[in-house]
């Protein structure tokens, strides 16, 4: 049967299955259970039935497990499914769970073409076996389905039409009004870095300084400092700009937190317990998070630091539980403090929160200059970070790995949502109940309340999103029936908050003109990958973001309208670039890009347009290259001969690591958080994440382009990356703009990768070194099989031994 495009939302209810066995007793089940017992040796088995929803081979929903209800399992569970798939059937699969996996009972098929008219289908569907014959008891499953095609959504392609936009629906946290947001590029910005960027109302863009603001927030807290991190390192200092000193600014983070705790401030920290850092695997952990050092530093002090493993929610199989605790992480990066009132009321306090991509750890402090060699005797002498070369050290010299990141400060009612997220996580994994009871402090700390009036031109509406499940957050509903009411999704016996993915999907679907993404990873929608050397259905990187982006571009090509997607990723994911895990991720990235370019090329041909697909979708990375200056730090030792390290040192170049997790849509809406564009971050039941989505109701892209803080922030980022500003940057969707940016990035790539170097690189934005063939295949750029100075393939390589769940 022909595959039909499903792009929109599917509402599905799975009610029950009737007569799963006939009058002859549950023979089928007895046999099944005996087989499982024999195979596994797990003792007497019980039936554990669950049902799944698949669009062809992509799993889009699953019910809870029902124990010992062999003949008439009744789930009565509803699902709200975003779809961007090709499918001929919606498939309902009934399975019996066991400790190692699951046994198929049968499948029921509802043809997609019956859904297209948007009418509700409510029916009993026959359950068939592998050969498409009815299972022997003539059993049926009762389901209800209704499909809402994306163009029927009144927000499709309309942007945020007014200040009455209610936010992303079906989420745990609703949108908050009257907030204030500060946007940060990098941990620090020196004075006078940003040129004049005009905003609406005759104003100019003013940058903020992240680690200075975090330092002030911690220093001035009087009641509580709550921190979560993938990594927190006590030895770093937050203040390092000699031109902007602060009283007490030379203190390390660890000493600052101890000092605040000794003053009576409640300091609580949840730091990911990197299980790989235990025992023989590796002394400093696969990812060197310093988790045990940090715990040790705060022992017997007033700071309560809890190492927090990524525990699975109850109900996974033995194998799944092992996967979650050893493969997945706590990735949220938040700081929550009490703070003075903006009006100077010295008695009352409010809550202020920070959310984004920056961990408070080593290797993160940087400025938009992203120097490789010139800060090695100052800001980075005691914070030399270079995990891409074995044995790299300050003694052997640069290049260090520069770090580009994005973060935010949230004030107003949204800040309390971040606090509530911390409280949920502490109650689940923090051990002792040490949380400050705000009710007892209500005469001091105000309740959640706006920090700006709705008619203030600088006010923000903000919504908090997460990827997290009941294994990491206390207070999620116990039953799947209650999950949708709380804006949550039910999984196989766990309740999941997957709202970060929902927020991205909604923002892409609303987009009118352009999308600008910076992210540490870009892979997913594996249901759309070519089966070249893999079985796409085995990969399970099913989040929709890449496919939603290409479907958005396709809709614009069909309508004859301009639309451009700009995506900035690192040259390679941090680590030894030749290693199997880095190469595997690059392979998934290539497959994702290729799926999108094939979609675009097909659409251009169908519409008779001859144009470079890179005018619609274009990928970049960041890099720097510096000539040697007199008076530069001279290392005492040299790297080993014939290594990537010595080659990069001699060529005076290295990538700038893009760690950001940000998307800007039409200069009116921004998402910033900890979540990467991969399955780990978007799944909800893998890495735990947090993000915010925000806009300024008085600066929407309705009648004319938006010129609020988000526009200023994007222009400031483009200035950082390109070393200049151009009039065309005001309209990123225009052919003039995308051609200009692509040309500059190609020029900078040529300078970066050339044999010789006469001047510093004039900008950091480099063309991602791939080609796009006439059918959309992603190819090597001529002469660029490997990244400069390495033997690491740009297009990556499939790993034969690392499971996809680890690298997607």
Swiss-Prot record:
Residues 1-30 form a propeptide. One of its GO terms (biological process) is phosphatidylcholine metabolic process. It holds the Pfam family C2. PROSITE patterns: C2 (PS50004), PLD (PS50035). One of its GO terms (cellular component) is endoplasmic reticulum. A 1,2-diacyl-sn-glycero-3-phosphate binds at residues 331, 520, 659. Disulfide bonds: none annotated. Transmembrane segments: none annotated. It is found in: Cytoplasm; Membrane; Vacuole; Endoplasmic reticulum. It catalyses: a 1,2-diacyl-sn-glycero-3-phosphocholine + H2O = a 1,2-diacyl-sn-glycero-3-phosphate + choline + H(+). The active site is at residues 331, 333, 338, 659, 661, 666. Belongs to the phospholipase D family. C2-PLD subfamily. C2 domain is a calcium-binding fold, and the binding promotes the protein association with membranes. A lower affinity toward calcium can be anticipated for PLD alpha due to the absence of two potential calcium ligands. Hydrolyzes glycerol-phospholipids at the terminal phosphodiesteric bond. Plays an important role in various cellular processes, including phytohormone action, vesicular trafficking, secretion, cytoskeletal arrangement, meiosis, tumor promotion, pathogenesis, membrane deterioration and senescence. This is Phospholipase D alpha 1. It comes from Ricinus communis (Castor bean).
